[in-house]
């Protein structure tokens, strides 16, 4: 019947990101292995700076996954800030070119991580502002946090 069709559950799924330490997936038991919606800027910066970012085994590189599956999907262009002696700033509008430069060594993991931190923080800023300015959201957040301890 029509009512049954309206009540069917919907599942929204996405690519499962690797854990930041190189694990096959993020772990709720290790807060350093994932970026959370309520992470502060300094948390994101620390986590990305310490993250696993190998040049070999690109399919095991969580930093590149953030670029491919999140950042480029939202921003369409990733700007990497680099010193002039390292080739200067460069914009990437596709993942393949960024990956090629990363593999060749012309894109250093440190420069990539700084850019990823910047973009993840841009994504999270409206969430942070919402929770900061909304007492009801703060209460709900505290309630959820209570379940994760």
Predicted regions and their residues:
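Conserved nucleotide- and phosphate/pyrophosphate-binding catalytic cores
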Residues: 1-149
């Amino acid at each position: 019947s029509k009512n049954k069709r309206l009540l069917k559950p919907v599942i929204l799924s996405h690519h499962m990101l690797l854990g930041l330490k190189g694990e096959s997936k993020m772990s709720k038991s290790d807060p350093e292995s994932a970026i959370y919606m309520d992470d502060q800027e300094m948390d994101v910066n620390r986590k990305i700076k310490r993250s696993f970012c190998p040049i070999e085994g690109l399919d095991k590189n969580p930093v590149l996954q953030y670029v491919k599956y999140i950042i480029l999907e939202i921003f369409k262009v990733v700007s990497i800030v680099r010193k002039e002696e390292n080739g200067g700033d460069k914009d990437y509008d596709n993942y393949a070119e960024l990956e090629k430069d990363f593999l060749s060594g012309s894109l250093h993991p440190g420069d990539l991580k700084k850019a990823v931190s910047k973009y993840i923080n841009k994504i999270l800023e409206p969430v942070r502002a919402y929770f900061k300015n909304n007492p009801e959201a703060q209460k709900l957040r505290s309630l959820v946090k209570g379940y994760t301890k």
